[in-house]
Amino acid sequence: MTILFLTMVISYFGCMKAAPMKEASVRGPGSLAYPGVRTHGALESATGPKVGARGLTSSSSSSSSSLADTFEHVIEELLVEDQKARPHEESAKDADLYTSRVMLSSQVPLEPPLLFLLEEYKNYLDAANMSMRVRRHSDPARRGELSVCDSVSEWVTAADKKTAVDMSGGTVTVLEKVPVSKGQLKQYFYETKCNPMGYTKEGCRGIDKRHWNSQCRTTQSYVRALTMDSKKRIGWRFIRIDTSCVCTLTIKRGR
């Protein structure tokens, strides 16, 4: 599992040419500031020297062990920093949680957001502390666990979204490209919504239809994106995107 995760992380950075995941304040042409955006795109000026593939494929077992230990240490530090950085105020939870769903990149992302992979790896580390028997019985596949609602996640561009609703309830135009010092990067949004081809399109899974009406519905949260309002003013605003699929219930009357 560790080797698989390390391979995914290496692939993530190799394909995305990602810049460090830190809050950035990038200035493009015209001194337009972009505060609080995680720039995961191909920013050559920010990435520094590139490491060749041969530097990551050592045949020595000691080198592999050292590499694994290094990655685990870095990942654990990222998880700790992410937990410390999360605000405790209820109003800021959505904005903090879904910041990772926006990516600036020169090409289509090939992997889910890195924080999603970190969360999966954290769950793996927690499971590693269990005994083999407990871990085997806690495997969702062995317990036959199924999601109440089937969902699907994918990266979409501003060309797909075109418009969105901001926090004031107004409709704004989502700009496809963001100017940076070395050119332009596209805005990508990692959206999660109910799967129209799933088995729960007629209702939630596991709900007693004799007593309840159920429906799987896509819900939205706010993320920051570069937009233009009806007065042609360009700026960073919080907009709503699809982020989850939840089950809604209403009790049947007259029974």
UniProtKB/Swiss-Prot annotation:
Residues 1-18 form the signal peptide. PROSITE patterns: NGF_1, NGF_2. Glycans are attached at residue 129. It is found in: Secreted. Disulfide bonds join 149-216, 194-245, 204-247. Residues 19-136 form a propeptide. Keywords: Cleavage on pair of basic residues, Disulfide bond, Glycoprotein, Growth factor, Secreted, Signal. The record marks 57-58 as: Cleavage. Its main location: secreted. One of its GO terms (biological process) is negative regulation of neuron apoptotic process. InterPro entries: Brain-der_neurotrophic_factor, Cystine-knot_cytokine, Nerve_growth_factor-like, Nerve_growth_factor-rel, Nerve_growth_factor_CS. Mature BDNF is produced by proteolytic removal of the propeptide, catalyzed by a FURIN family member. In addition, the precursor form is proteolytically cleaved within the propeptide, but this is not an obligatory intermediate for the production of mature BDNF. Can be converted into mature BDNF by plasmin (PLG). GO terms for molecular function: growth factor activity; nerve growth factor receptor binding. Residues 44-67 are annotated as: Disordered. GO terms for cellular component: axon; dendrite; extracellular space; synaptic vesicle. Pfam families: NGF (PF00243). Belongs to the NGF-beta family. Important signaling molecule that activates signaling cascades downstream of NTRK2. During development, promotes the survival and differentiation of selected neuronal populations of the peripheral and central nervous systems. Participates in axonal growth, pathfinding and in the modulation of dendritic growth and morphology. Major regulator of synaptic transmission and plasticity at adult synapses in many regions of the CNS. Monomers and homodimers. Binds to NTRK2/TRKB. Can form heterodimers with other neurotrophin family members, such as NTF3 and NTF4 (in vitro), but the physiological relevance of this is not clear. BDNF precursor form: interacts with the heterodimer formed by NGFR and SORCS2. Mature BDNF has much lower affinity for the heterodimer formed by NGFR and SORCS2. This is Neurotrophic factor BDNF precursor form.
